[in-house]
């Protein structure tokens, strides 16, 4: 039988560990974790480069994404570009100035994943990540339901 308490504890524990790994970068840059999340999302998801993409796929509130984008563009780390076909759509691009910071954040992110899975063999890591992806997909499906059903 599955221990649901463990499942609900994992995201909180990992989230705290993950965010803590970024503290030196946050102190160095003066950015918030949310701003780093937006920068990382754009770096890790080429082609998914609108504020709406960040909101929907990363699960950050629209107002928070908007505020983060304002800060990042104000610091010259992101730029905005209107879509060629629909000028209402604004694409976000990491600037030349923002690229080194995005790479540094990606390195921290990769190190977090590496440390987390370090106790597993390569085969176990593959199986774990495949199972995790299936659970995430199922979670997405269930999140659309109105209430929990047995």
Language model regions located:
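Surface-exposed, interaction-prone regions with an acidic/low-complexity signature
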Residues: 1-9, 62-65, 147-149
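N-terminal positioning helix adjacent to the helix-turn-helix/winged-helix DNA-binding module
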Residues: 3, 34, 50, 97, ...
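C-terminal regulatory/oligomerization modules of transcriptional regulators
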Residues: 1, 123-150
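Short, locally clustered residues in the helix-turn-helix/winged-helix DNA-binding domain
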Residues: 15, 40-46, 106, 133
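N-terminal helix-turn-helix DNA-binding core of bacterial DNA-binding proteins
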Residues: 20-64, 147-148
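N-terminal leader segment of winged-helix/HTH proteins
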Residues: 1-29, 75-77
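Charged, amphipathic alpha-helical coiled-coil/dimerization segments
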Residues: 19, 70-133
């Amino acid at each position: 039988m599955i221990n649901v308490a463990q499942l609900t504890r994992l995201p909180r524990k990992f989230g705290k560990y993950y965010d803590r790994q970024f503290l030196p970068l946050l102190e160095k840059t003066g950015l918030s974790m949310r701003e780093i999340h937006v920068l990382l999302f754009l770096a890790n998801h080429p082609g998914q480069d609108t504020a709406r993409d960040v909101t929907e796929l990363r699960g950050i509130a629209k107002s928070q994404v908007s505020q983060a984008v304002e800060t990042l563009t104000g610091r010259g780390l992101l730029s905005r570009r209107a879509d060629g076909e629909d000028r209402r759509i604004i694409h976000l691009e990491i600037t030349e100035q923002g690229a080194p910071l995005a790479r540094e954040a990606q390195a921290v992110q990769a190190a977090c994943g590496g440390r987390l899975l370090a106790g597993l063999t390569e085969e176990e890591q593959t199986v774990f990540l495949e199972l995790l992806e299936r659970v995430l997909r199922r979670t997405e499906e269930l999140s659309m339901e109105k209430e929990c059903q047995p």
